[in-house]
């Protein structure tokens, strides 16, 4: 049976009223005057209509030919850098030729413009007052205002999407990458008004430096001789499309020194051994790159043994003459050291964030912005104040009828036992150490294991085998062989298949961690736990307790649950789903991975998981029907009940993808239910979760915040700065250890359950207290967190992924979608991903 749900997003049913009423400051600035005239909208085609780099299209827009064609209308026109343009004036339809080359070497490209429609910004006033639904007219109006707001900062700053940077005071992150701090601004529709959301933005950029110096830092080479031995072709994918100039002593100040090249890769041979054919006096001549620069530019290469960079048209340039162009974002994934440096750079106390936002607002000086002024747009320079509520903290149940009432979102495990330890004792397990005996001697491991077993025993986990066999990894063997050896050793000593395997790693890195997880999760079907050697040496009971929380759920236990009074699910059997899609980073191979977790108990504490591969960068989850059928059957098998309600938390979707979630994923959930029985029709609620936004909230009174100056856990914001009529709210559910608390933005897309807002908001908040591996409330509902964890581990089951940077063709980036390595059936009912 096919099901076609409504394409409308759920409307706000009302507001909540529970909790302490407070007032917060929000980083939104109200637009007090909008353009009150009709704006002409035009369709723009550059060249043959194929995608043109944004920088090039912006150069064309700023060309003298386009300015002459537009006349006086150019100054009040706004261009999106792609295919749309808006103007107060009338511009004739037509096509002109623009020279994008030099005067000596002209290169013409066509620029066509055609009027497509008119937009009336009065529709925005109706929209924010819930008198007009969202349609292309509203979206075009918001896009126009966004671009109008960007126009002035775009003239002098480095801009990316909604963020702008001066490029000054960068801080090194290592590897030729540095962190810049700038500001973010975006037009937002709110309840009764439009506003500008302003925030601090931090991003990683390639350092404006010699490419040679950056390569040496990236490869950790201390001198150029070491770099000549390094296979730079392996880095082709990493450095591809990086823009450089070619500068040497004999072209300083010339157009040639300013010409920008885009790296395509690195040559396999050195500059002295890389040859090309040129025509000289009518004859073809073979010449090396090193010889060419000596003959044609009178410069001798200092490092002729280094390879060259490859650019378009097959040209080759010596690395030592190349300089990285300023203002290029570093889009690859930061390594662990760079990430730590970025966190230190970006973290700010709340009052510092407020001050910097206010400073940026005054620097932008919207009142004197000529583009805003000519359209009559005025923006208030004071942060909005918004009403908020602080919900009551839930109570948590542990074993032995122990009830915990957290304070400020935190508690500890002292004197507590897990609610539901594994019924069978731990009879068989083993430890493998990937650190040398010199760095971590056996005595250190034995001391740790004694504390570890004592701590887990006090938490309720019963160990028959208190002293497991310990092996040191033989680095000559593969990780697969080592895992199998450890499995057999545990089985031999314990006379039973291992309950889990324990691995001690030297540091937190993708390997051998990834291989351990792949082998244990797919081949051996045994839970695995990894720990870092420095923690083993310290042997702290608190660290052991943290490991215990993971071990307990991996072997089938439950750590804690909400007390009945704190659980809004009540007695109605409810399946909770969490969904997420992981996409490979820039330059990485591999497929996208969709992961769904589902509760298999009546309290929403225990979750099983499914992950599937799908085409790269596809956000809608494929095969949702089959996945949900499997998860519904699992819920029934574990609880002996059929869920009467399904609550689906979906992460990672942008506002533009909301309808896709309704029309595709919700439809398949419905079909899954009907496939089990034509009469089976549970009520469904679909809610998206978003953390990648720039809404931030700051306390007005100290008594309404924590010791760091952030709003308290349980703070709900659902008025003023939320959507004009859709059912959304912001929730700060966690205590922030450092920096500014990031609220999660919840948007209910579809609601058949019709829980009152108070009940649903309380459910979202209270679930954050039963995340299985923490003794603090987390920032996001656990099913979504679990889906993240599943996706992260499922990457190691992707047979097409390759974390090494090798030369890659465009075709290989669109490779066939192969299924992930199958999860062992022995793990399917356990929380193996913790």
Curated annotation (Swiss-Prot):
At the top level, the lineage of the source is: Eukaryota
- What are the Piwi domain coordinates in residue numbering? 500-799
**Cellular location(s):** Cytoplasm; Nucleus; Chromosome, Centromere; Chromosome, Telomere
The chain positions of domain PAZ read 210-326
One Gene Ontology cellular component annotation? cytoplasm
Q: What is its main location?
A: cytoplasm
Sorted keywords for this record are: Cell cycle, Centromere, Chromosome, Chromosome partition, Cytoplasm, Nucleus, RNA-mediated gene silencing, Telomere
User: Can you supply a Gene Ontology BP term from the record?
Assistant: regulatory ncRNA-mediated heterochromatin formation
InterPro entries cross-referenced by the UniProt entry: ArgoL1 (IPR014811), ArgoL2 (IPR032472), Argonaute_Mid_dom (IPR032473), Argonaute_N (IPR032474), PAZ_dom (IPR003100), PAZ_dom_sf (IPR036085), Piwi (IPR003165), Piwi_ago-like (IPR045246)
Outcome after substituting residue 580 to A: Lower target RNA cleavage activity. Up-regulated centromeric transcripts from the dg and dh heterochromatic repeats. Defective for centromeric heterochromatin assembly and silencing. Decreased association with siRNAs
Give the protein's biological function: Required for G1 arrest and mating in response to nitrogen starvation. Ago1 regulation of cytokinesis and cell cycle checkpoints occurs downstream of dcr1. Required, indirectly, for regulated hyperphosphorylation of cdc2. Has a role in the RNA interference (RNAi) pathway which is important for heterochromatin formation, accurate chromosome segregation, centromere cohesion and telomere function during mitosis and meiosis. Required for silencing at the centromeres and for initiation of transcriptionally silent heterochromatin at the mating type locus.
Any idea what this protein is called? Answer: Protein argonaute
């Amino acid at each position: 049976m096919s099901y076609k749900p409504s394409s409308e997003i759920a409307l706000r049913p009302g507001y909540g009223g529970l909790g302490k009423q407070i007032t917060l400051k929000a980083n939104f600035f109200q637009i007090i005057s909008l353009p009150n005239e009709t704006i002409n909208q035009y369709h723009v085609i550059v060249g043959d209509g194929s995608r043109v780099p944004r920088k090039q299209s912006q150069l064309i827009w700023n060309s003298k030919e386009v300015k002459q064609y537009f006349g006086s209308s150019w100054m009040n026109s706004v261009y999106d850098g792609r295919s749309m343009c808006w103007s107060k004036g009338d511009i004739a339809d037509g096509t002109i030729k623009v020279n994008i080359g030099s005067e000596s070497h002209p290169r013409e490209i066509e620029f066509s413009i055609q009027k497509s429609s008119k937009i009336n910004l009065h529709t925005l006033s109706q929209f924010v007052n819930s008198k007009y639904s969202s349609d292309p007219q509203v979206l075009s109006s918001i896009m126009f205002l966004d671009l109008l707001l960007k126009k002035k900062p775009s003239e002098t700053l480095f801009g990316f999407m909604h963020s702008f940077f001066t490029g000054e005071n960068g801080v090194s992150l290592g590897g030729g990458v540095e962190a810049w701090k700038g500001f973010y601004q975006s037009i937002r529709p709110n309840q009764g008004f439009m506003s500008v959301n302003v925030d601090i933005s931090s991003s990683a950029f390639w350092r404006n430096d010699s490419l040679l110096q950056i390569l040496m830092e990236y490869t950790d080479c201390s001198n150029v001789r070491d770099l000549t031995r390094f296979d730079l072709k392996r880095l082709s994918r990493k450095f591809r499309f990086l823009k450089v100039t070619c500068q040497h002593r004999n072209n300083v100040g010339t157009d040639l020194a300013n010409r920008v090249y885009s790296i395509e890769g690195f040559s396999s041979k050195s500059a002295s051994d890389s040859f090309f054919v040129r025509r000289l006096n009518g004859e073809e001549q073979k010449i090396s790159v090193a010889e060419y620069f000596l003959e044609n530019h009178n410069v001798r290469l200092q490092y002729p043994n280094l390879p060259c960079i490859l650019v378009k048209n097959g040209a080759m340039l010596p690395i030592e003459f190349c300089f990285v162009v300023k203002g290029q974002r570093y889009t690859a994934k930061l390594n662990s050291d760079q990430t730590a440096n970025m966190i230190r750079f970006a973290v700010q106390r709340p009052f510092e964030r407020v001050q910097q936002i206010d400073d940026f607002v005054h620097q932008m000086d919207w009142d004197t912005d000529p583009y805003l002024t000519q359209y009559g747009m005025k923006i208030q320079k004071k942060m909005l104040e918004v009403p908020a509520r602080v919900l009551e903290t839930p109570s948590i149940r542990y074993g032995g009828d122990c009830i915990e009432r957290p304070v400020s979102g935190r508690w500890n495990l002292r004197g507590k036992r897990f609610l539901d330890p594994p019924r069978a004792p731990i009879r068989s397990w083993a430890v493998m150490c990937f650190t040398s005996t010199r760095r971590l001697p056996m005595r250190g491991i034995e001391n740790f294991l004694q504390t570890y077993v004592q701590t887990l025993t006090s938490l309720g986990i019963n160990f028959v085998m208190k002293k497991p066999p310990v092996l040191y990894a033989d680095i000559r063997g593969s990780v697969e062989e080592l895992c199998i050896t450890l499995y057999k050793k545990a089985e031999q000593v314990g006379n039973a298949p291992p309950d889990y395997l324990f691995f001690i790693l030297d540091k937190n890195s993708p390997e051998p961690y990834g291989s351990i997880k792949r082998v244990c999760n797919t081949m051996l079907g045994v839970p695995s736990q990894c720990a870092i050697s420095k923690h083993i040496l310290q042997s702290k009971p608190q660290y052991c307790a943290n490991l215990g929380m993971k071990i307990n759920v991996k072997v089938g236990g439950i750590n804690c649950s909400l007390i009945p009074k704190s659980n809004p699910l009540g007695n109605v059997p409810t399946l909770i789903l969490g969904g997420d899609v992981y996409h490979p980073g820039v330059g990485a191979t591999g497929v996208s991975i969709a992961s769904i977790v589902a509760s298999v108990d009546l309290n929403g504490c225990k979750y099983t998981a499914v992950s599937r591969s799908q085409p790269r960068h596809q956000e809608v989850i494929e095969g949702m029907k089959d996945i949900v059928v499997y998860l519904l059957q699992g819920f029934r098998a574990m609880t002996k009940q059929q869920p009467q309600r399904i609550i689906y938390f979906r992460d990672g979707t942008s506002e533009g993808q909301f309808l896709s979630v309704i029309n595709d994923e919700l439809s398949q959930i419905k079909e899954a239910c009907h496939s089990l029985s034509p009469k089976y029709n549970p009520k469904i609620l679909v809610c998206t979760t978003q953390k990648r936004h720039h809404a931030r909230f700051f306390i007005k009174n100290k008594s309404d915040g924590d010791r760091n100056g952030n709003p308290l856990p349980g703070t709900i914001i659902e008025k003023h700065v939320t959507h004009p009529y859709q059912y959304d709210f912001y929730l700060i559910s966690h205590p922030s250890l450092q920096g500014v608390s990031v609220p999660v933005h919840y948007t209910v897309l579809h609601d058949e359950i019709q829980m009152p807002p108070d009940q649903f908001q309380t459910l979202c908040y209270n679930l954050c207290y039963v995340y299985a591996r923490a003794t603090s409330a987390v920032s996001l509902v656990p099913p979504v967190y679990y889906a993240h964890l599943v996706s992260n581990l499922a990457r190691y089951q992707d047979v097409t992924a390759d974390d090494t940077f090798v030369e890659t063709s465009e075709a290989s980036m669109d490779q066939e979608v192969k299924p992930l390595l199958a999860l062992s059936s022995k793990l399917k009912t356990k929380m193996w991903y913790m």
